[in-house]
Amino acid sequence: MGLFAEYGVSGRLTLQLKADWQDGEDAFVDYSGRGPIEIGATWQVWRDDRNAVSLYGGYTQAGEGRNAGYAAPGVGDHDWEARVSVGRSLGPMGERWGMDGAFVELQAARRLRDGLPDETRIDATAGARIGEDWMVLGQAFGGAADGGARWLSLEASVVRDFGAWSMQAGWRQTVAGQGIPISRGPVLAIWRRF
């Protein structure tokens, strides 16, 4: 179970917090405990009517659970991450298919890790609103640890708005990789805007 919180300090600066509790088992070990806790900030560097570019910097303190999908539980100490995100509104293109607010986003990150190999990550998202209260999302999460594990997970989900609250339901699955466990399962989330 995880927690993700984001707070807009200003129109261009947001603060983030990520934390989770892990309870898992694989062929070699059962584990339960606090996962990594990450704090960070995102600065919107540039924006126009259809495009946006932002930079993220974050720090992660490792936990007792898996701090990396390819490492044993509890391995690793702390991480630093730098990330750039580029997003684009598809404007009228999405409207032709009955979607409003269609967008794509690409993120590239470098994670410097203490006690684990450094990582390069690439994440991509495509999404669109369907009507006033629904959104569909397709996401890909890929990465490579220096000299080791590689992974690609895909996620498809729908989000339903209920005023300031939203519920997300979907499925995430590892579709390719090397030196990592294959994972798959439901994605359930509750969002609150304030």
PLM segments and residue spans:
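Transmembrane beta-barrel domains of Gram-negative outer membranes and organellar outer membranes
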Residues: 1-114, 118-121, 128-193
